[in-house]
Amino acid sequence: MSPNKDSSSLNSSGAGLVCLPPVSEELQLVWTQAVQTSELDGNEHLLQAFSYFPYPSLADIALLCLRHGLQMEKVKTWFMAQRLRCGISWSSEEIEETRARVVYHRDQLLFKSLLSFTHHAVRPPQEMPPVTPPEQVALGLRPLALSEPTQMKGLKVEPEEPFQVSQLPLNHQKVKEPLMMGSRTLNHQSDCQDLQISGLSKEQAGGGPDQSCGGGTASWNHSIAVHQPDKSPLISLLDNSCKEESEPSGTPPSSSASSPFQVLANGTTATPKPLQPLGYIPQSFSPSEQALSPQVEPLWSQRLRNNSVPSRVGPTEYLSPDMQHQRKTKRKTKEQLAILKSFFLQCQWARREDYHKLEQITGLPRPEIIQWFGDTRYALKHGQLKWFRDNAVLGTPSFQDPAISTSSTRSLKEWAKTPPLPAPPPPPDIRPLERYWAAHQQLQEADILKLSQASRLSTQQVLDWFDSRLPKPAEVVVCLDEEEEEEDEELPEDGEEEEEEEEEEDDDVIIRD
């Protein structure tokens, strides 16, 4: 990517610049001053968050800023700069896989050792990380393995001295090469590490050995895995800054490439080790670093489990019941359907002007009219339109092709003279009837016409409404057949009583004698 005028003017200033990775789908690089990326280095909350996981989500960053009064853009820039300095470049799959491991071991700060490389210059260890086997290299990129130990002995931490950058002419031809993510090997590792440790921009890092850090600082010789994530907008720029071809170790370096030699802590020079192919990733930390003292998990990091599987809420859940009711399609009136059907009998494929005229006449929204025509054509094609067969003119094709809609122009002229349908009357209102009933409890004949106008009901409907309010009379059921049977049954009983009375009288007479 060729430097523009703004970047050239920024490079001419005394402050160091950092070219951060792309942060959007358009792969726009971010140029920022090195002071802005290091002004938050002393914030313990950010250090602890980066030690826990170097790829926090936007929700985690927002929660950090809300709790500790920080600016979100500065915090995002700080995290990008830390990953750039530490040589961290993961794909989205690697981020999710490592995030799951970190959440599982959330009582440890697994990335604490990376922070020591960020703010301090280190001397080269006695034993370098082993080379990845070829079969692992062929598999491509993979996240940092947290289970494979690596010997990191002889590590001495010293405070990093502020660096001075000398301005040299830039080789624009080298820098104008296109951005190629994950397609070339990293040809010069010392150049990459100077960029990581000192925070130089791409143009400053490519200006020669004079633009690197002071002689007392050593470059940590990593092999960086560069890959463009599919989903995460935080893409590393190391491939773009390190893609220049390195010169042979015996020839003097050019003005656009840094020196192929490394300056060690004791002042001696050493040639770089053979270049590792793309996909090589440094192994994990030593067991002593993994056995850190248990730390309390930050509160913001507890949301990592929820952020890994974002919840998806349907759009209808955010709508109120009134909004959902409005979204429902209203039923078309008989007049509207009659107009649509009469037009469909003449032309099955309406034009834009026809839709506009139908929209004015029927008062229906345009999407509903278009949907009705599509559904009606589908039903006609499958022989499910009886009213069309009954009303179709003889000689008219049953299904008209849109390419030969000759009657559309004629129908447009006819429909242009059709007046729009009158507005539908408002619905009846029975509240005046209820108020009248509550006040009088009885309907007067003089008030029938007045109530009919107020409620928009006919006089008969008003009478029926008041009749429904009147109390219903009690129902009396008379069964004549049952009564006659009961009378017939009662007659023999009366005869028996008379006979008994006569017998008693006879007995009385006998006793008297």
From Swiss-Prot:
DNA-binding region ranges: 31-90, 324-384, 418-477
Residue ranges with Low complexity bias: 248-260
A Gene Ontology BP annotation from the UniProt entry: regulation of transcription by RNA polymerase II
Residue numbers carrying Phosphothreonine: 418
MF-aspect GO terms: DNA binding; DNA-binding transcription factor activity, RNA polymerase II-specific
Localization terms from the record: Nucleus
Protein name per the record: Homeobox and leucine zipper protein Homez
Source organism per UniProt: Rattus norvegicus (Rat)
